[in-house]
Structures are given as structure tokens and as C-alpha cells.
């Protein structure tokens, strides 16, 4: 299948390269193998592990969580998350350049109850090739509208665009198209690149670098308003980093992560008004909830916000680093924002 590019009005972000004209593998390009995974386990988790009846977390009300386990070496490392606005279809990318497409199941009272139909597919490069080595570290997804998505990568810092087709039907052979990086992004640290990304209002895109220029300094986000790039500064706490961004309604939602060997992992879910992007002043984000030692805390790197069961529902996913350290999990947690 051969398709012409359809990223308008984000066409201004397209890199000028002769390879940038198709979004699906042609007959001369290999189509990578994909596969449904079966026999995985789903274990419910409590938000307060020592107090199973407790459901509140700051301004958030818990709406269920799952620990997903599978022996397939492709499963894990989930670093970004997008959920359709009806709350049923999930799309994720991993540190090893795989897509995951799946269906979310919810109980009648709005609790996350299961993940079914998990399919894992290689995420392809700009020549239709499978990605390996420093090319494979996919970190963020932004939904560009329709069936089009952008994916950011670190180590070899770049952004690719993909057309996945209706209901992700073209995910198996979607070829990356080069999108233009924000100014200076190519010089970011090897393992500290474009960690969060969200697109909105047709031609606006917001991208977050993982670490502030100096510890405790404001986070630096790159904002494209349809015409120009500008820097956005968001106040940070010492030791924290940006791991994900998403827009919902009139707010930007952001995940922050803290980790040291001595103190372990902490996660903050925050938000700030969309209109503050154009203000030019330092943004002070609103803390919605924080995960610490008493909670099922892990390396959460993906966030998506939807309207579900009449509530603003936040879903986060953790990157278990393929459990290389023996104590990490692939967790999917859901929360409702309490008014």
C-alpha cells in the first residue's frame, strides 16, 4: 500500500528529505512480523497496598489498576500511551521500538477491569526497516488527528510521523516520515531527550525534554503554535524529570518522576492551563496526586486523559525496563479527577 503524506496542517513540521513521501511500506520494503500475545496474567492492584479500602490520592479517586505480566521478550518497556476518547482502544510504544495495540475493559461503575487483544508490532523506521540499537528508543506519542501519530525517539533524537489507518489496521506496515525537531533538540543528552509530546488544535504541538537544564531549574518545553517555536518554562522540584504530556480540555497534564537508589521512585501527576503556554511567564503546575512508597509506584512514563463514565479519567502506564532489575512491573492505573 502506497499513500501520500497527509499531515496537514502540521506540514510545516515536515523535514525536507526525499524519503518523506510515503507512510506505508511498498512492495519493495519488508513488512515486519506482528503478533497477538496470549496467556498473559492480569493482577488487580490497590492504590494503597496496606489499606485496600482507601481509594483517594490527593485530588484523584482511584478507578482500578492492573499488573500485566508476560514472558514474551517484546512485552514491557512501555514509555508512552494514547487512548481513544471512547476509552476502549489503547496505543503504546516501548523503549525497544514496538507498538502495542489493545482494548481496555471497564466495569459498569467505571473501573479499569482488563486489557484484552494485546498485539505487539515492530515500529518501523523511515526506510521501512525494523529499528535496532540507538535507533530504537521510542519515548512519546502525540495523536495528530484521524489515524496519524507522531513518535519521538531519544539517543538518536528525532520525531517520526505514522499513519496507522482506521482502528490501527495499518500499524504493521506504517513507515516513519521525518518531522522537524524543535531548535536545539538534536543536541540533547543521549538518554535525556524528547520524553513527552502532545498535539492539539490542528497545528499546535508541545514537547517536553526529560530533564531541566540544571537540577531544580524549570522544565523546558518546546511549543509550536502553528507558526513558530518558543520555549515554555514550568517550575520543577529537585530531582524530578518530565516523563509524559497530554492535552485534555483546557489543560495540559504532565507526569513527573523522581528516582534515586537511596530514596526510590516518586511520581507526580500535575496539570496547568492550556492558555498559560502563550503567557511567556513561569508556569506553576497544579499537583493532582502523588505516588510514593505506600503506593504501587514504578517508572511511570505514559499518561492519557479521557472522559469516561461521566468523569475526567487519567490512565498512566509504567516502563518496567523489561524488569532488568528484578523489581519492576508493567502497571496500568486509572484515576478520576474529583471536582
Model-derived features: where do they sit?
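Sequence/structural signature of beta-propeller domains
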Residues: 16-339
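Positively charged n-region of N-terminal signal peptides that target proteins for export
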Residues: 1-4
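Bacterial N-terminal signal peptides
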Residues: 6-15
Amino acid at each position: 500500500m502506497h499513500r501520500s503524506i497527509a499531515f496537514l496542517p502540521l506540514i510545516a513540521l515536515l523535514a525536507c528529505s526525499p524519503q518523506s513521501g510515503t507512510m506505508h511500506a511498498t512492495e519493495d520494503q519488508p513488512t515486519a512480523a506482528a503478533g497477538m500475545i496470549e496467556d498473559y496474567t492480569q493482577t488487580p492492584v490497590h492504590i494503597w497496598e496496606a489499606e485496600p479500602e482507601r481509594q483517594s490520592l490527593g485530588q484523584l479517586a482511584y478507578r482500578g489498576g492492573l499488573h500485566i505480566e508476560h514472558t514474551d521478550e517484546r512485552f514491557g518497556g512501555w514509555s508512552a500511551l494514547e487512548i481513544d476518547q471512547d476509552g476502549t482502544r489503547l496505543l503504546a510504544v516501548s523503549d525497544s521500538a514496538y507498538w502495542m495495540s489493545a482494548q481496555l475493559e471497564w466495569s459498569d461503575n467505571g473501573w479499569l477491569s482488563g486489557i484484552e487483544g494485546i498485539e505487539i508490532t515492530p515500529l518501523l523506521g523511515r526506510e521501512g526497516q525494523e529499528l535496532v540499537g540507538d535507533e530504537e528508543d521510542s519515548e512519546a506519542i502525540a495523536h495528530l488527528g484521524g489515524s496519524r501519530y507522531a513518535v519521538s525517539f531519544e539517543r538518536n533524537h528525532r520525531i517520526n510521523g505514522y499513519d496507522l489507518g482506521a482502528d490501527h489496521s495499518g500499524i504493521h506496515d506504517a513507515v516513519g516520515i521525518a518531522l522537524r525537531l524543535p531548535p536545539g533538540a538534536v543536541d540533547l543528552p543521549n538518554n535525556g531527550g524528547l520524553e513527552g509530546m502532545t498535539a492539539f488544535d490542528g497545528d499546535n504541538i508541545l514537547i517536553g525534554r526529560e530533564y531541566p537544564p540544571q537540577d531544580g531549574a524549570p522544565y523546558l518545553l518546546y511549543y509550536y503554535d502553528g507558526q513558530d517555536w518558543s520555549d515554555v518554562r514550568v517550575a520543577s522540584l529537585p530531582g524530578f524529570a518530565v516523563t509524559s504530556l497530554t492535552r485534555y480540555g483546557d489543560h495540559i497534564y504532565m507526569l513527573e518522576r523522581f528516582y534515586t537508589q537511596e530514596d526510590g521512585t516518586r511520581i507526580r501527576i500535575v496539570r496547568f492551563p492550556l492558555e498559560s503556554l502563550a503567557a511567556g511567564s513561569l508556569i506553576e503546575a497544579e499537583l493532582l496526586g502523588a505516588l510514593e512508597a505506600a503506593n504501587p509506584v514504578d517508572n511511570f512514563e505514559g499518561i492519557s486523559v479521557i472522559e469516561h463514565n461521566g468523569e475526567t479519567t487519567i490512565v498512566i502506564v509504567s516502563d518496567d525496563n523489561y524488569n532488568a532489575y528484578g523489581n519492576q512491573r508493567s502497571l496500568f492505573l486509572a484515576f478520576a479527577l474529583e471536582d
